[in-house]
C-alpha cells in the first residue's frame, strides 16, 4: 500500500513540478498541450474562449499559441489575477449566463472554445458523471452560441452516465469529433476529453 501511494505522489509531483517550472499554475496545461501537439487545435491569430479558466493554465497556454495577433478571453466565477499577456483577458462571471449585453461584450466570432471544468464531486461515480455531463452540455450550448461556423470545441467530461448523450449532441453541431485521454491524466481517472471540429452553421442556446 505504501509503495502505491508513493507512486501516486511521485506522478502528481512530476507534473506539478513540471508546470511550476514552466510558469503555469496547474499541471492541466499538459493535457491541452498533448491535444495541441496532436491536432493543432489552436493557431496564431485565433480568438479563443476559455470557460472556467481558473487558475489560468489553459488561458496562458492558449495566449502563447495564438500570439499577439490573437485574443483569449477566460471566464470563471472564481476570482483570478489578470493575465500578464496583452492578448489575454479574464472576466469574472458565470460563463453560462449568455445575456445579450454579455454577448455584445465578448462577441460571437470565436474560433475555439475550451472547457476544462469539473463539478464539485461527491465520490459517488454515477452522480459525479451526471453532474459532469450537465456541465458539459452547458459548455456545449455556450460554444455553439459563440463559435464561428467551422470553429472547434474542447471539453472535459467524466465517463459514465450522460456521456453517450453528450457525444450525440456534439455530433449534432460538429462535423467530426475525437475522444481522447491524455497521457498526463491518471490512468484510474474517469476524466476524458472530447474535441469537436468544424462547427456546423447556425447557433442554438439550450434552455
Swiss-Prot record:
Q: Does the keyword Methyltransferase apply?
A: yes
* One term of GO molecular function: rRNA (uridine-2'-O-)-methyltransferase activity
Which reactions does this protein catalyse?
Answer: uridine(2552) in 23S rRNA + S-adenosyl-L-methionine = 2'-O-methyluridine(2552) in 23S rRNA + S-adenosyl-L-homocysteine + H(+)
Subcellular location(s): the record lists: Cytoplasm
**EC number(s) of the enzyme?**
2.1.1.166
Known HAMAP family for this protein? RNA_methyltr_E
Protein name (record): Ribosomal RNA large subunit methyltransferase E
Amino acid at each position: 500500500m505504501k509503495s502505491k501511494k508513493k507512486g501516486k505522489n511521485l506522478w502528481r509531483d512530476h507534473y506539478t513540478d513540471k508546470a511550476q517550472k514552466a510558469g503555469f499554475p496547474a499541471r492541466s496545461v499538459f493535457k491541452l498541450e498533448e491535444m495541441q501537439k496532436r491536432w493543432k487545435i489552436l493557431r496564431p491569430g485565433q480568438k479563443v474562449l476559455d470557460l472556467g479558466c481558473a487558475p489560468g493554465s489553459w488561458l496562458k497556454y492558449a495566449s502563447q499559441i495564438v500570439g499577439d495577433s490573437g485574443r483569449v478571453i477566460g471566464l470563471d466565477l472564481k476570482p483570478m489575477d489578470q493575465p500578464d499577456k496583452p492578448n489575454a483577458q479574464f472576466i469574472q462571471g458565470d460563463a453560462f449566463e449568455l445575456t445579450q449585453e454579455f454577448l455584445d461584450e465578448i462577441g460571437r466570432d470565436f474560433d475555439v472554445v475550451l472547457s476544462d471544468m469539473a463539478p464539485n464531486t461527491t465520490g459517488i461515480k454515477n452522480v459525479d458523471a451526471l453532474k459532469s455531463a450537465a456541465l458539459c452540455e452547458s459548455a456545449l450550448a455556450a460554444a455553439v452560441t459563440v463559435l464561428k461556423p467551422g470553429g472547434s470545441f474542447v471539453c472535459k467530461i467524466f465517463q459514465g452516465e450522460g456521456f453517450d448523450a453528450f457525444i450525440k449532441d456534439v455530433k449534432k453541431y460538429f462535423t467530426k469529433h475525437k475522444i481522447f485521454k491524455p497521457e498526463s491524466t491518471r490512468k484510474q481517472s474517469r476524466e476524458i476529453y472530447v474535441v469537436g471540429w468544424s462547427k456546423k452553421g447556425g447557433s442554438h442556446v439550450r434552455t
